[in-house]
């Protein structure tokens, strides 16, 4: 569903428990203003936000979420964790059972008519007229926006198509578009006018690797222009590459939120050993109390030892035990490590 005015989907609008402290890492792939985001007014704030469906299913439970302005904010969670339900409440598509949500400082869904023209959204895939071509679909979206100047409509549509790389396919019927092309067209609809907030639910779904890189570059470009981007994705690598901040959901509850750098740093990382003797190495490390041992060829990894364990002593124990050590060290924690530690779930976190 793409929301930009009242479009083909009929939706109105254009469209933690322990916050981590500190600044985002200095990374050219991230918004250079991320370090100042902690002081920015939040563009999204929820307090006790709860959604219980008929039949008693509790989809979102007492969510306290804060999205600072000027950030690229990643929203992560396993299947059924409540991510999409949260987004639908933020956009006014469904009402909460309890609690409050503010978007751009205004209550939702009550102030949707004021808020949604400043928000572009791509939720659960774009709503398109299959019998119209790509350009005609965007013209429909633009006509549905009462604030859009009809005199510049064509120029806006062409600029949006160019920005998402669909100019060459703009006269092709939407029903013939691939999934990735439909995602691009939905994103173009969300970008027909400048937005203060862009909400994207799995924006790279269906894209090939080059298309994914292009969308990531576009997200960074939008952030550099001052747009706050709220991004739900099942690709942890994508979140690490493009997001400055993130929140993790599990079973309808917020587990943690903070900068991506701090969330990754909060993971203990992994001890890595490269050796032609992985069996002996695993036995010796286990004897010294290490857990989470995993071997892949000549590479052995384990949970990082506690701070009071001397790595030099572990290395010496391996050598004295006849293990031929080619590499030994602790690799820094990743967002994936932090996610698994926080949720107990594996890498596939779509939903």
What are the roles of these predicted feature ranges?
Residues 40-46, 51-250, 256:
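ABC transporter nucleotide-binding domains
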Residues 2-21, 306-351:
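C-terminal coupling/interaction segments
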């Amino acid at each position: 569903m793409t929301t930009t005015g009242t479009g083909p989907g009929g939706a109105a609008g254009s469209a933690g428990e322990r916050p981590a402290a500190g600044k985002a890492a200095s990374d050219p792939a991230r918004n250079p203003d991320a370090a100042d985001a902690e002081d920015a007014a939040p563009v999204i704030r929820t307090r006790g936000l709860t959604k219980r469906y008929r039949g008693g299913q509790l989809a979102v439970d007492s969510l306290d979420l804060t999205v600072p302005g000027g950030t690229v904010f990643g929203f992560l969670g396993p299947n059924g964790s409540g991510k999409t339900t949260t987004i639908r409440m933020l956009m006014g598509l469904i009402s909460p059972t309890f609690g409050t949500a503010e978007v751009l400082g205004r209550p939702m869904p009550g102030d949707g008519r004021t808020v949604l023209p400043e928000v572009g959204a791509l939720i659960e895939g774009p709503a398109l007229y299959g019998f119209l071509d790509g350009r005609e679909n965007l013209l429909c979206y633009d006509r549905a926006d009462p604030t859009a100047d009809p005199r510049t409509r064509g120029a806006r549509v062409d600029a949006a198509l160019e920005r998402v790389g669909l100019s060459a396919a703009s006269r092709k019927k939407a029903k013939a578009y691939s999934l990735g092309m439909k995602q691009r067209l939905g994103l173009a609809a969300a970008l027909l006018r400048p937005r203060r907030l862009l909400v994207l639910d799995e924006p790279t779904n269906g894209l090939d690797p080059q298309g994914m890189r292009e969308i990531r570059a576009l997200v960074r470009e939008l952030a550099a222009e001052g747009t706050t981007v709220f991004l739900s994705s099942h690709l942890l690598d994508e979140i690490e590459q493009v997001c400055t901040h993130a929140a993790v959901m599990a079973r309808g509850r917020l587990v943690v939120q903070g900068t991506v750098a701090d969330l990754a740093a909060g993971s203990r990382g992994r001890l890595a050993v490269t050796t032609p003797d992985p069996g002996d190495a695993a036995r010796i490390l286990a004897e010294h109390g290490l857990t989470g041992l995993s071997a892949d060829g000549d590479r052995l990894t384990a949970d990082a030892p506690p701070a009071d364990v001397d790595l030099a002593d572990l290395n010496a124990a391996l050598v004295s035990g006849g293990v031929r050590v080619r590499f030994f060290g602790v690799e820094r924690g990743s967002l994936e490590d932090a996610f698994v530690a926080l949720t107990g779930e594996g890498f596939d976190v779509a939903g």
